[in-house]
């Protein structure tokens, strides 16, 4: 591919993550976007368990049974000349680490807000990560087909709580049973929820923002409220500023209903006008890798086992940061400096796959992994070593001892635990004194998902013995003396054979520091 062809291909890419608090409608809007991309003919409804019509992005068995997203899904489609890569992330706070890593692999984010509830805790946490990265954030105020808060209240809350300017692209006309449509100030039209002609749901606006010709909503109370709200925004609201949007200092706001697919097309079309093409990525030594650099590079931000349970396979998800990927190319794994050939590569629609012949910066590809990759690994095909910045890793707070319920299933148990730990949702430790397996996690749901998947995917029922909340602190191996261990500070080692203590509480940690003042303890490696 020539430099000109590479530039054209890269500039067509739009890669974004969808973030929200659980149940705000994140997965539903993902489904509707796939409809516009022609990927699915009808959206799977998360709550409709009896029909078996599950969300396309919720592909894992436990997600289908519980109606929650506990793993990031990757989906790709073409729309209006652009190649769109969507990463649908877990909404549940126990799986924040997976979401945080995913946000390192995108160029922008879509924040979905339940319009009846406004800003919720998980939304705020994920927004801060986006803000820290300085990526553009687009806001979709969802569920206006139900009773919702006043639009101005929602905008003010976003500005006050999140500290970002808002610019409403459109404005809702009513909500709930009185949801009449959307006033689209950006595209100069009104979209009706119940138009007289279903093939033409739009009313054009003149230069002054008034409906041209007959207005079926004229005299309607919801219409007048919407006009009053729009007038206030026009006079006292923020000016549209594309530079601020690019820096993540202003968020375009869209109102609509993902469930009824109203306002989603307006969002997608407008998003493509503002969203950035693939961006630069920093390396650990301070260099910047640009998307149009001719040499291929990328990093592993996610590992997923058993996307096809029949084959017990494992996929390493790679964000391409620069250049072009061609099937069969040779690359170097930065961590080991070992060469490898990328022959078996795939792209995704959740759990559905297609082989990839070529891909460019901005794309997400999947590498079949036989144990070579770790989360955070960098790969490249140039002469210069590239190691991208480290991905965030959370220190676990909850711990359980785990063992196989059936001693005859040890082989399945060990295979399952080793593969699932590679995904990074739970951390694995071994006791120095007993050799027991110990799992660490941020939240209880991670243990439940691990237990379910061990039985469902590896036919290995496990027994978990809660150890409660602990404080994990790593120690330099040169300073370690196994006699330091006690019932209040259990000595274990992680999967890299690095020693650490699990302290019972803050008092136990303080007591240890007083007894061994020269020993340095760290919260993370």
UniProtKB/Swiss-Prot annotation:
<keyword id="KW-0547">Nucleotide-binding</keyword>
<feature type="binding site">
    <location>
        <begin position="88"/>
        <end position="92"/>
    </location>
    <ligand>
        <name>GTP</name>
    </ligand>
</feature>
<comment type="similarity">
    <text>Belongs to the TRAFAC class translation factor GTPase superfamily. Classic translation factor GTPase family. PrfC subfamily.</text>
</comment>
<dbReference type="GO" id="GO:0016149">
    <property type="term" value="F:translation release factor activity, codon specific"/>
</dbReference>
<dbReference type="InterPro" id="IPR035647">
    <property type="entry name" value="EFG_III/V"/>
</dbReference>
<dbReference type="InterPro" id="IPR004548">
    <property type="entry name" value="PrfC"/>
</dbReference>
<dbReference type="InterPro" id="IPR053905">
    <property type="entry name" value="EF-G-like_DII"/>
</dbReference>
<dbReference type="InterPro" id="IPR041732">
    <property type="entry name" value="RF3_GTP-bd"/>
</dbReference>
<comment type="function">
    <text>Increases the formation of ribosomal termination complexes and stimulates activities of RF-1 and RF-2. It binds guanine nucleotides and has strong preference for UGA stop codons. It may interact directly with the ribosome. The stimulation of RF-1 and RF-2 is significantly reduced by GTP and GDP, but not by GMP.</text>
</comment>
<protein>
    <recommendedName>
        <fullName>Peptide chain release factor 3</fullName>
    </recommendedName>
</protein>
<dbReference type="GO" id="GO:0006449">
    <property type="term" value="P:regulation of translational termination"/>
</dbReference>
<dbReference type="GO" id="GO:0003924">
    <property type="term" value="F:GTPase activity"/>
</dbReference>
<keyword id="KW-0342">GTP-binding</keyword>
<keyword id="KW-0963">Cytoplasm</keyword>
<dbReference type="GO" id="GO:0005829">
    <property type="term" value="C:cytosol"/>
</dbReference>
<dbReference type="InterPro" id="IPR031157">
    <property type="entry name" value="G_TR_CS"/>
</dbReference>
<dbReference type="InterPro" id="IPR000795">
    <property type="entry name" value="T_Tr_GTP-bd_dom"/>
</dbReference>
<dbReference type="Pfam" id="PF00009">
    <property type="entry name" value="GTP_EFTU"/>
</dbReference>
<dbReference type="Pfam" id="PF22042">
    <property type="entry name" value="EF-G_D2"/>
</dbReference>
<dbReference type="InterPro" id="IPR027417">
    <property type="entry name" value="P-loop_NTPase"/>
</dbReference>
<feature type="domain" description="tr-type G">
    <location>
        <begin position="11"/>
        <end position="279"/>
    </location>
</feature>
<dbReference type="InterPro" id="IPR038467">
    <property type="entry name" value="RF3_dom_3_sf"/>
</dbReference>
<dbReference type="InterPro" id="IPR032090">
    <property type="entry name" value="RF3_C"/>
</dbReference>
<feature type="binding site">
    <location>
        <begin position="20"/>
        <end position="27"/>
    </location>
    <ligand>
        <name>GTP</name>
    </ligand>
</feature>
<dbReference type="InterPro" id="IPR009000">
    <property type="entry name" value="Transl_B-barrel_sf"/>
</dbReference>
<feature type="binding site">
    <location>
        <begin position="142"/>
        <end position="145"/>
    </location>
    <ligand>
        <name>GTP</name>
    </ligand>
</feature>
<dbReference type="GO" id="GO:0016150">
    <property type="term" value="F:translation release factor activity, codon nonspecific"/>
</dbReference>
<dbReference type="InterPro" id="IPR005225">
    <property type="entry name" value="Small_GTP-bd"/>
</dbReference>
<keyword id="KW-0648">Protein biosynthesis</keyword>
<dbReference type="GO" id="GO:0005525">
    <property type="term" value="F:GTP binding"/>
</dbReference>
<dbReference type="Pfam" id="PF16658">
    <property type="entry name" value="RF3_C"/>
</dbReference>
